[in-house]
């Protein structure tokens, strides 16, 4: 990073965003173009704005600053929370979130990754996945409604026909969207898609989702960063000198990625040799199958990351090579 960098910690919500700069002052602006211009007036060529990934709320400001040649980093909320918990033990609870993000930026400056936004193809892929998920939820709701209606003594034929038409329509739309997604992913990541898809337990649809949701795995330098992004890393709570409570996954990461991996784990625990060994070993220790499946999710993600970074295709006989890349 540039010497004498002027850092800004930015906490963004739907309507406003709070800012803390190196001068210690606090600002609050509207999360719209008028607020963006006021934020820009605080910056110069040595400024570096750091914010959390907040779904979609951060995107407009991040793109605005990026287009104005201001350095931007969009960090995993879990990374910031852990930093505060582990290293800033003297931090006071009355500090604003933007101030804590500022302190995170200053103390982890060498680890901050510059944000470059998404390409038009990546944006289109993300939008397709979002709409596909919406249609999938609607399909589930309609199927439940159809089942309820058909279980009635005298179901209305018009209602039944309407529900079936809607289900057919949604299925056709989902199929079209997934075909479009496949074409887009192949444009930039044909080789990566083939490699990720070679992992037992990860099918084509899941491979596409993994590639899109991780930005082709390019946003991560370590597998541990990727697992943290997915919210699969354990979180242990501790208060004072009290005994630590049972660890659990954070669930603060990308829910869509975590759900995709969990569905893959159900197959991987049977057909992926390394995953099966992990699953069987954990269950044999008396731990729950859910804990074992989470471990399988971690393993799958690490395998995908290793293949993405190494250029290798999955081969159970080369597990040692893959492990060295984890």
Which stretches of residues belong to each language-model region?
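Phosphate-backbone recognition surface of nucleic-acid-processing proteins
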Residues: 29, 34, 210-285, 289, ...
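Helix-hairpin-helix/helix-loop-helix acidic hairpins
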Residues: 148-205, 214, 269-272
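Short helix-capping/linker segments at secondary-structure and domain boundaries
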Residues: 108-113, 142-143, 216-219, 268-274, ...
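Generic structural signal for well-ordered, non-transmembrane alpha-helical segments
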Residues: 133-136, 140, 165-175, 298
């Amino acid at each position: 990073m540039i010497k004498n960098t002027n850092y800004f910690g930015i906490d963004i919500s739907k309507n406003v965003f709070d800012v803390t700069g190196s001068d210690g002052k606090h600002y609050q602006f509207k999360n719209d173009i008028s607020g963006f211009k006021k934020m820009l007036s605080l910056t110069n060529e040595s400024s570096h704005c750091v914010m959390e990934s907040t779904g979609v709320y951060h995107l407009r400001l991040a793109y605005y600053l990026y287009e104005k040649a201001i350095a931007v980093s969009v960090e995993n909320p879990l990374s910031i929370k852990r930093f505060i918990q582990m290293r800033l033990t003297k931090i006071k609870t009355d500090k604003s979130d933007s101030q804590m993000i500022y302190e995170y930026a200053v103390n982890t400056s060498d680890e901050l990754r510059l944000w470059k936004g998404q390409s038009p193809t990546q944006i289109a892929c993300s939008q397709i996945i979002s709409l596909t998920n919406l249609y999938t939820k609607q399909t589930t709701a309609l199927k439940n409604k159809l089942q309820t209606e058909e279980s009635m003594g005298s179901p209305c034929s018009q209602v039944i026909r309407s529900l079936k038409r809607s289900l057919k329509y949604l299925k056709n739309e989902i199929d079209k969207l997934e075909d479009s997604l496949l074409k887009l992913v192949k444009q930039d990541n044909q080789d990566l898609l083939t490699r990720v898809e070679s992992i037992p337990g990860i099918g084509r649809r899941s491979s596409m989702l993994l590639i899109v949701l991780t930005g082709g795995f390019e946003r991560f330098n370590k597998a541990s960063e990727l697992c943290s992004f997915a919210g699969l890393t354990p979180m242990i709570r501790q208060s004072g000198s009290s005994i630590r409570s049972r660890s659990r996954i954070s669930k603060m990461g990308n829910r869509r990625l975590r759900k995709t991996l969990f569905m893959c784990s159900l197959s991987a625990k049977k057909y992926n040799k390394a995953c099966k060994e992990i699953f069987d070993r954990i269950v044999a220790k008396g731990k729950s199958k859910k804990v074992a499946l989470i471990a399988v999710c971690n393993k799958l993600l690490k395998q995908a990351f290793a293949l993405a970074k190494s250029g290798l295709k999955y081969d159970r006989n080369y597990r040692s090579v893959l492990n060295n890349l984890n």
